[in-house]
């Protein structure tokens, strides 16, 4: 469902059913239907990460921040980015502490060549966070680092 933010930009209110539909659609369209199921969670991000993939649980999870004004293009790009993580982890069986390594980039290049998709390696430059000021760079990077080294 499209709404407009205070700047008049159309955005999408995240719904789990819509994200699950997108997962199935993008899986068929871009990954030839090979991705196994993945839990999708809509959460409030407190560290300015718009989305992330958690491979540490039995059934991996994709988390999407609800406190973002998601445009259609941003949502598609970021969601497919997280699906690439799922592909690398579950299909290619690549197990690494570092998430945006050569294998990840190789899959992104394949998607660009085959489908014309541009998947950014790092957080998509989202400018529409809902009523929050941006934390300092040091705080932001510290939170990201701790997320990777601490067990969940």
Regions found by a protein language model. Give the residues of each.
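Active-site recognition of the HExxH zinc-binding catalytic motif
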Residues: 77-90
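Metalloprotease/metallohydrolase-associated module, dominated by Zn2+-dependent proteases
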Residues: 2-73, 90-152
